[in-house]
Amino acid sequence: TPLVQMGPNDWLLELFHGPTLAFKDVAMQMLSRLMDHVLRERGERLTIVGATSGDTGGAALEAFKNCNGIDTFFMFSNGKVSDFQRRQMTTIGAENCHAIAIDGSFDDCQSMVKDMFGHQSFANKIRLSAVNSINWGRVMAQVVYYFTAAAALGAPEQRVSFTVPTGNFGDIYAGFVAKQMGLPISRLVIATNENDILARTLTTGDHRLESVKPTITPSMDIQISSNFERLLFEAAGQDSTIVRDLMAALKNNHNYSLPDKMLTFIRDSFDAGVVSEIETLEEVALILRNTGYLTDPHTAIAVKVAREHADPDVPMVTLSTAHPAKFPDTVHDATGKTSHPPVWGDIPAERSETVAHLMNDRACVEAHILEHFFRAQKLINSTAKD
């Protein structure tokens, strides 16, 4: 995770040097090995089911493809991820890895995953587990690069700020955990696109769901950020009753209002900025023109927001969460340049895709998962007899 200097007290933290060219690799590669080791020791199997707005699915399927005791299923919104992101999921070619295209939004996919955990008979039968950022292991691994980046820039004597492209709130929440652990973080800045529920919440205290707007930064096309609930728990003084009531209001009324004390707690650590679609394209071009550096659109949003929240006395680190080659059409539209993936992240054009297209219906998805589960069990039993 190298730091690249863009200007005075202006840094990028490159998190895209893993096998799928996204920051999700940092945690996923560790988590897959830990889970596989424990399951082998116990002689057990698990089924992972997850939802992805783009990068998590590819990173998870890549990380778990050699874990024979773990069957991995990932849902994504059909047509709402880039071609490169889709092919990362659909060309894995491993018997235990499955990509599912859903006719619905990412929030629909994520809600189905949560509901599956509440469907006890299903969850128990397949031994359901998760590796989305609701998995604490993911957050824990991401805390590390906040410490390494800050230490490289002079911490603990020097305070450091971070700006993070934010969708599901897991990456920036890891920064909050680092701050709670004692890392001298001045500000944590949420950078988002026009799906700006987190920025609106920070400004007004009103957390109100709106329709998801499809954009050129699909990893931010989210209205329900799972890890924001973790921050609410801290803001509520770890009172789970308060958080439960807020979540119930969100589910039933599609909004809640934060008490002043909780809002003040959040504002003590966080700022936020919103960047439009046009501004994103302009920023990708501006960064290239000024520095010769090509960014993906999510990183470009964060760079613009970081500039708007810069303090000349405090280093600002912008998290660069994906390689620009993951979004070639957007990068080309903005700059006229073609970004090619490094050799280790390239996907041969002739590699075939395998994907299940399913309705936005939990029962339908569960039936699909069970079909594969029973088929795998039958194969295991047959092998054991031999």
Spans of features found by a protein language model:
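PLP-dependent amino-acid enzyme catalytic core
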Residues: T1-D386
